């Protein structure tokens, strides 16, 4: 009986190490290679621009991505604060270990990739040098009953694209016109400095925290996807057209397009309040989505080309 328990513990330890190593490599890969949908959208936008300057800027972005892969380095020097959105089944065997192993994976990736040191302890104001600290990496949880799968969304929240983020609660009389005004105000004021073209995540709910979380989850959706609600999907298109009309262009240098798209995520609200929030991803929108089964077999649907290299 004791031997069986020891074997089980060793098996668990090996599985934890394997998942840690996979996630460390996936974090590093996400830092270096942009998602397939982002690359495709940037190419589409480049082809639709009609001035030499805008085309040169887009070509520089593609050259940057080419060099990131060739030199095995991050596609942007600001590798952000690591954030994970975990949708985990209650029967996934490593659910109890996930938060700790994700932290260890970030530490490994910081050295191996390498990642810039971006975790500063607030009030004490020192950089930990490991990209981990109090509450970082951030892990948001969705628990899925009776499932043995685990989905992990990886996101690198850079400083520039984080700055436009904001949330507020509107009076119900302000309606969706108020939501539109709030979003456009943030984009006209701060979008220029967030390294456009941007992916804009809009969250609608009751309070600032529900709206803010919705807006972050919106950034995890594929470029070009639409809200399931027809009215919300229509608003996504209207906001996209409105922000494009500002004419930010690539890197804020002017052009026909300011955004790769607008994604809205919403939850039911209190009758007396409309919570709204904005989160923004820059042109180097580094998000990754990996799905594990109970045996740690995995699929990646955001990127082509990721392969786990098992250590000897």
Regions found by a protein language model. Give the residues of each.
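Non-transmembrane, aqueous-exposed alpha-helical and coiled segments at domain scale
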Residues: 2-312
């Amino acid at each position: 009986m004791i031997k069986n328990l020891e074997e089980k513990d060793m098996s668990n330890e090996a599985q934890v190490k394997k998942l840690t190593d996979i996630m460390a490599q996936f974090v590093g890969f996400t830092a270096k290679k942009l998602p397939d949908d982002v690359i495709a959208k940037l190419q589409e936008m480049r082809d639709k621009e009609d001035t030499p300057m805008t085309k040169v800027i887009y070509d520089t972005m593609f050259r940057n991505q080419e060099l990131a892969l060739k030199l095995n380095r991050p596609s942007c020097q600001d590798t952000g604060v690591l954030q994970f959105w975990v949708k985990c089944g209650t029967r996934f065997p490593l659910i109890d270990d996930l938060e700790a192993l994700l932290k260890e994976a970030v530490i490994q990736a910081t050295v191996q990739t390498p990642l810039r040191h971006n975790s500063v302890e607030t009030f004490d104001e020192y950089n930990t040098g490991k990209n981990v600290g109090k509450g970082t990496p951030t892990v948001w949880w969705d628990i899925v009953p009776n499932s043995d799968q685990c989905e992990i969304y990886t996101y690198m929240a850079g400083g520039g694209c984080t700055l436009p983020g904001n949330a507020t609660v509107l009076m119900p009389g302000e309606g969706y016109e108020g939501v539109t005004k709030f979003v456009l105000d943030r984009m006209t004021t701060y979008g220029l400095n967030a390294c456009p073209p941007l992916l804009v995540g809009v969250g609608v709910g009751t309070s600032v925290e529900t709206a803010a979380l919705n807006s972050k989850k919106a950034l995890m959706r594929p470029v070009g996807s639409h809200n399931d609600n027809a009215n919300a999907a229509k608003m996504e298109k209207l906001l996209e057209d409105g922000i494009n009309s500002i004419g930010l262009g690539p890197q804020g240098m002017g052009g026909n397009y300011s955004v790769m798209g607008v994604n809205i995520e919403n939850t039911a609200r209190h009758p007396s309040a409309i919570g709204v929030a904005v989160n923004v991803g820059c042109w180097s929108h580094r998000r990754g989505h990996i799905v594990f089964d109970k045996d740690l077999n995995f699929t990646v649907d955001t990127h082509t080309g990721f392969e786990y290299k098992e250590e000897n």
